């Protein structure tokens, strides 16, 4: 009882004597104000050099470019190809008369892949204690977590 009281009082004494070391140390405490001002000036200069998106290409210039190119672009042609549903060749049935991802083909492919995953032999057993090599060593020596599986 006496030694634990001395230990606790000593720890409390250290906690009150060393407040800077027991508190949180913020990252910005190690950066000087001069460095922060230099960084702020650098950011301001970069912002001045980089034009805003609205200022970079005025809307009048865009409309003039569209008129020069012919008919104005439709909203669908502005979308990237990966955003669309399917491309026109797939929508019309492709070259061979049917799309490459017809629903029955796709479901059959997914079923076969799932079946292959479920029936595939497990090359590595699950072990919560050791890796594969340690399991083999443990099995031969009687040590390890999975040694009960290898009894002969």
From Swiss-Prot:
Keyword line: Cell projection, Disulfide bond, Hormone, Phosphoprotein, Secreted, Signal, Vasoactive, Vasodilator
Pfam families in UniProt: ANP
Superkingdom in the source lineage: Eukaryota
Site (described: Cleavage): 122-123, 129-130
Coiled-coil residue spans: none
GO (cellular component) term, any one: perikaryon
SMART domains: NAT_PEP
Cystine crosslinks: 129-145
Keyword Secreted: yes
Example of a GO MF term: neuropeptide receptor binding
Prosequence residues removed at maturation: 25-122, 92-102
GO BP term, pick one: cGMP biosynthetic process
Region (Important for degradation of atrial natriuretic peptide by IDE): 146-150
Signal peptide start and end residues: 1-24
Region span, Disordered: 58-101
Posttranslational mods: The precursor molecule is proteolytically cleaved by CORIN at Arg-122 to produce the atrial natriuretic peptide. Undergoes further proteolytic cleavage by unknown proteases to give rise to long-acting natriuretic peptide, vessel dilator and kaliuretic peptide. Additional processing gives rise to the auriculin and atriopeptin peptides. In the kidneys, alternative processing by an unknown protease results in the peptide urodilatin.
InterPro entries named among the record's database cross-references: Natr_peptide, Natr_peptide_CS, Natriuretic_peptide, Natriuretic_peptide_atrial
Keyword Secreted recorded: yes
Post-translational modification Phosphoserine, affected residues: 128
Similarity section: Belongs to the natriuretic peptide family.
Protein known as: Natriuretic peptides A
């Amino acid at each position: 009882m006496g030694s634990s009281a001395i230990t606790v009082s000593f720890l409390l004494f250290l906690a009150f004597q060393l407040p800077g070391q027991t508190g949180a140390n913020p990252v910005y405490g190690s950066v000087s104000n001069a460095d922060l001002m230099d960084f702020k000036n650098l950011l301001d200069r970069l912002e001045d050099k980089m034009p805003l998106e609205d200022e970079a290409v005025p809307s009048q210039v865009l409309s003039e470019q569209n008129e020069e190119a012919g008919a104005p672009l439709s909203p669908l042609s502005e979308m990237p190809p990966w955003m669309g549903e399917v491309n026109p060749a797939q929508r019309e049935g492709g070259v061979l008369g049917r799309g490459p991802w017809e629903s029955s083909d796709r479901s059959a492919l997914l079923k076969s892949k799932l079946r292959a995953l479920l029936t595939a032999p497990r090359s590595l057993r699950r072990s919560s204690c050791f890796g594969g090599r340690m399991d083999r060593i443990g099995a031969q020596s009687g040590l390890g977590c999975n040694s009960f599986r290898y009894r002969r």
